[in-house]
Amino acid sequence: MRKVFDIATIHKFERHLLERMLKLNTMSTYLRMLRAVYNRALLAGLTGYVPGLFKHVYTGTRADVKRALPPAEMGQALDISASLHRELKEAQIWFALLFLLRGMPFADLARLRKCDFKDGVITYRRQKTGRQIRVHVTEEAAELIRRCADRRTDSPYLLNILGDENCRFPLGRREEYRHYQQVLRRFNRKLKLLAAALRLGGKLSSYTARHTWATTAFHTRVAVGVISNALGHSSVKVTETYLKPFENEMLDRTNKKIIAYVKKCSIRQG
């Protein structure tokens, strides 16, 4: 444990993430998770204190990239009646569920258990933060759940996302993670094809539905604190990172309104 938590090893891990061509926010997530493990190990006396251990690696968040779709394009993506190849249709249904279930992360959707869905409500714990989330399932979402339900009697999963015909359930944590990573890569590839098939101007990824839910709520004047709770974020600061790219747009629109109002008043005075 002590050999893991030294400055050279942390820098080596960051270089490994860079070599994998990961985006800065993804790298930051891995490094912040490692920092959380270090802090717990430190409290438990399993490792020693290393000053500035994470000082020179990137643990921030960038908010300069918009991942959300405009409402009209999101509406197209949710239109399940569109004629598509079977595999693209499956990806579209999963994507729609991410949005309809209050911007649920794909990591949580894939791991939902059959026992999590009861009396029209899904109750689960977020993989990332451990926070318990309760989501009322709309009729539209319930129909999509029925369409992609995991009907294997030995499978604990609500949806037919993880595992294949050769799987023996229950999956171990390592095997579940391996299956999830494989499915996630395929899902993102299919979403790119789906965006092209639907002729969407924006890109689709497993994050798009969640970001679109958050930004749509923001533009319809839902309080940031409410959005944060709905998404199960660890703090409002995380939510603000989602929404920061849209702040300048809103400020620019406000500025134009103020200028127009002042000019209108000056004309009346004249």
Indicate residue ranges for each PLM-predicted region.
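N-terminal core-binding DNA-recognition domain of tyrosine recombinases/integrases
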Residues: M1-V65, I80
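Basic, Lys/Arg- and aromatic-enriched nucleic-acid-binding interface segment
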Residues: L24, S28, Y49-F106, A110
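Catalytic-site neighborhood detector that most strongly recognizes the C-terminal catalytic loop/helix
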Residues: A68, R126-G130, D164, L231-K256
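Active-site/catalytic core of tyrosine-dependent DNA strand-transfer enzymes
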Residues: M74, E139-G201
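Short, basic (Lys/Arg/His-rich) helix/loop patches that form interaction surfaces
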Residues: D79, S83-R86, H179-Q181, R185-N229
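Short, polar N-cap/turn motifs at the start of nucleic acid-interacting alpha helices
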Residues: C115-V121, G201-G202, V222-T241, R268-G270
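DNA/chromatin major-groove-contacting recognition/catalytic segments
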Residues: H136-E139, C148, K244-G270
